[in-house]
Amino acid sequence: MDSWKFVHVCDTQPGSPRSFRYRPAWLENQQTAYSQIKRLQPELVLVGGDLTRDGTLHDFELEEAKRNLDALEIPYYAVPGNMDVGNKFTLLQSPTPNDDLSANVTSANLERFARVFGAFPWSFVHRNVRFSGCYAAVAGSGL
């Protein structure tokens, strides 16, 4: 059997110079990671969310994240993270930031992500290995 490689990457959260929370080091970290991925020459890349810093606020961050992944010139499959589409789904506001209703994942944010990165959840077979990706925060939410 031939050997082959794939990469799983997540939480790069680079932000954007156009966003209010931008820090240049975040983008530099992502660029370093993507440079290392290109050197590894994997057959595919799995992206496990948090491709953006403020993707729930700025469409341009989702679009920049896609351009950066496209530049790898390696097939990739992405699922969102809370920074991309919203946090866990909660029904009640609480005094702690952990249950902030305004940070809930929404169907609109899920649809925005899918328009940029494609449908999810996804599942496919590559070299007799099944890969599946989903966004667990929507479990039990009805979304």
Question: Which residue ranges define each predicted feature?
Answer:
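Extended active-site neighborhood of metal-dependent phosphoesterases/phosphodiesterases
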Residues: L57-L143
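N-terminal active-site segment of His-dependent metallophosphoesterases
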Residues: M1-D59
